[in-house]
Amino acid sequence: MSVTYATLGELKVGSYIVIDGEPCRIVEMSKAKTGKHGSAKAHVVAVCLFSGNKKTLTAPVDARVEVPIIDKRIGQVIADMGDMVQIMDMETYETFEVEKPKDEDLKSKLQPGVEVEYWVVMGRYMITRVRGAPKS
């Protein structure tokens, strides 16, 4: 199970939400009460974790929304393969390939032997940061 559920009113800026099947981080949120008998609405602007696209959602604050479960793990870069890197998990020792991040500063630090923090979000992998210099 890679998602859990929460009400939209409980979420804040910086929280994570699933919009159109994509995991996103909330960057802007506003709530408005509509009229005498209307329910309060929330307008959410979020950025997709994998593509960087902006997505919006307008719904009642008591609406149930999906929240992605983010598994934060540590791995070691084994090989640089162009626009992909091969990573070995430091706990399970399984190896897998991950697309390089779009951030040029982070991308330049990815070399064999470097420890990285990566996230598993809805069955997809993303590298979030480099933990230290390669061990020689």
UniProtKB/Swiss-Prot annotation:
Keyword RNA-binding annotated: no
Alphabetical keyword list: Cytoplasm, Hypusine, Initiation factor, Protein biosynthesis
InterPro entries assigned to the protein according to its UniProt record, in alphabetical order: IF5A-like, IF5A-like_N, NA-bd_OB-fold, Rib_uL2_dom2, Trans_elong_IF5A_hypusine_site, Transl_elong_IF5A_arc, Transl_elong_IF5A_C, Translation_prot_SH3-like_sf
GO molecular function: ribosome binding; RNA binding; translation elongation factor activity; translation initiation factor activity
Subcellular location per the Swiss-Prot or TrEMBL entry: Cytoplasm
Chief place of localization: cytoplasm
Modification type Hypusine: residues: K36
Keyword Protein biosynthesis assigned: yes
Family annotation (Gene3D superfamilies): 2.30.30.30, Nucleic acid-binding proteins
BP GO annotations: positive regulation of translational elongation; positive regulation of translational termination
A matching Pfam family: IF5A-like_N
GO cellular component: cytoplasm
Task of the protein: Functions by promoting the formation of the first peptide bond.
Family: Belongs to the eIF-5A family.
NCBIfam families, sorted: eIF_5A, PRK03999.1
PANTHER family linked: TRANSLATION INITIATION FACTOR 5A FAMILY MEMBER
Name under which the protein is recorded: Translation initiation factor 5A
